[in-house]
């Protein structure tokens, strides 16, 4: 009903893009995914495992595995 409004016309936006560009909709999604992966990687870099190391393996696990069980919970026969 009001075709003279800027959000219904293709006039340039803040950075020179069209006002109704689909890239402006996908940028927050892609940025959030990349930022989430990057943030989790930076957070987990200095925190490789959450439990103190045992005699061998990578430490105790939360599901009943002892301190000597290797990474993944397999029995230590190798």
Swiss-Prot record:
UniProt GO cellular component terms: membrane
What are the UniProt keywords, alphabetically? Membrane, Transmembrane, Transmembrane helix
Q: How does it sit in the membrane?
A: Single-pass membrane protein
**Record's subcellular location:** Membrane
Q: Which domain of life is it from?
A: Bacteria
| Listed transmembrane segments | 21-43
Is Transmembrane helix set as a keyword in this record?
yes
Chief location bin: membrane
UniProt name for this protein: Uncharacterized protein YojB
Query: What organism is listed for this UniProt entry?
Result: Bacillus subtilis (strain 168)
Q: Give the gene that encodes this protein.
A: yojB
């Amino acid at each position: 009903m009001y075709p003279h409004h800027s959000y219904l016309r293709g006039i340039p936006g803040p950075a020179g893009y069209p006002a109704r560009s689909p890239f402006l909709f996908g940028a927050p999604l892609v940025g959030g995914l990349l930022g989430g992966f990057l943030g989790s990687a930076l957070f987990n870099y200095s925190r490789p495992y959450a439990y103190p190391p045992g005699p061998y393996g990578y430490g105790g696990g939360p599901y009943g595995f002892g301190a000597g069980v290797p990474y993944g919970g397999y029995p230590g026969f190798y």
